[in-house]
């Protein structure tokens, strides 16, 4: 599969959110929540945009604490990590101002779990202070299932100036992925088949493209037509095979699967 970035409707949604943040009025409302279901291409889009625009890119993970977050920011800004957090933050703010650099925090729910003394969601609070003081903005990227958690604190909720949502690719975007990323030529109808089997989930589209390339290699073809694929299942969406959640109803009766 080719190493190439394909601009889609999700890219347009993301850049629209960025424009809103750049043109916002209040410097204190420096947070933007960018969310979507797993597999829609959030990381793909923000990584491409962030690298092209000099953003500080942070990837949250299980076990990441506040000190790890601060260290990651300093490392990307070329600042020496130090024990005096106040001095380190001041230097971070100065560099962010000078570089006019935005901050992108992927898997931002990790920042909600951080605690410093009596401060909850310390990671998000730290980024909020940086964004406000440096007159820049912070993109907080998360799954749809995590969005509500950012409303638990009024201090954070009132600093979120904008929310943008990403979705599974439409048919035309799926066709663009297939045509631009596949290492072999693609005939009419193949892109539509990929969309039908994947539902436009970017991760599944990538798997489907790999399957197409494998079929072409086995058959010795430089171009794949719909007839070459036959009834082959290009991808398996394992999410569909998971046991459904059972939720209790409020009246005490058994809940249904969802």
Locate each region found by the language model.
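C-terminal alpha-helical "lid" subdomain
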Residues: 2-13, 39-48, 53, 172, ...
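Pre-Walker A adenine-sensing motif
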Residues: 9-26
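Walker A/P-loop nucleotide-binding motif
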Residues: 26-46
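Sensor-1/coupling segment of RecA-like P-loop NTPase cores
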Residues: 32-38, 126-153
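Short regulatory helix/loop adjacent to the ATP-binding pocket of P-loop NTPases
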Residues: 49, 146-161
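Short glycine-rich substrate-engagement loop in P-loop NTPases that contacts/grips substrate
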Residues: 60-98, 118
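Conserved AAA+ ATPase "SRH/arginine-finger" region at the nucleotide-binding site
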Residues: 60-62, 149-150, 161-173
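Conserved P-loop NTPase "ATPase switch" module shared by AAA+ and STAND
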Residues: 95-120, 142
């Amino acid at each position: 599969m080719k190493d190439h970035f394909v601009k889609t409707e999700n890219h347009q949604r993301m850049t629209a959110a960025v424009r809103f943040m750049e043109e916002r009025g209040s410097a204190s409302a420096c947070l933007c929540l960018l969310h979507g279901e797993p597999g829609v291409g959030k990381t793909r889009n923000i990584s491409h945009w962030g690298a092209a625009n000099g953003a500080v890119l942070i990837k949250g993970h299980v076990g990441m604490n506040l000190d790890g977050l601060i260290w990651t920011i300093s490392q990307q800004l070329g600042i020496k990590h130090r024990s005096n957090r106040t001095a380190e933050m001041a230097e971070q703010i100065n560099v962010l101002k000078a570089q006019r650099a935005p901050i992108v925090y992927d898997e931002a729910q990790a920042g909600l779990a951080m605690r410093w003394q009596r401060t909850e969601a310390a990671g998000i609070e730290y980024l909020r202070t940086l964004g406000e003081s440096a007159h820049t903005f912070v993109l907080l990227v998360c799954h749809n299932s995590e969005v509500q958690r950012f409303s638990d604190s009024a201090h954070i909720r009132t600093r979120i100036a904008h929310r943008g949502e990403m979705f599974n690719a439409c048919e035309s975007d799926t066709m663009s992925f297939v045509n631009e990323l596949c290492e072999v030529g693609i005939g009419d109808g193949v892109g539509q088949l990929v969309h039908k089997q994947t539902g436009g989930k970017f991760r599944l589209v990538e798997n489907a493209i790999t399957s197409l390339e494998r079929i072409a290699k086995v058959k010795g073809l430089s171009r794949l037509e719909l007839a070459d694929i036959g009834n082959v299942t290009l991808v398996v969406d394992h999410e569909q095979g998971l046991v459904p959640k059972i939720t209790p109803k409020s009246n005490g009766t058994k809940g249904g699967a969802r």
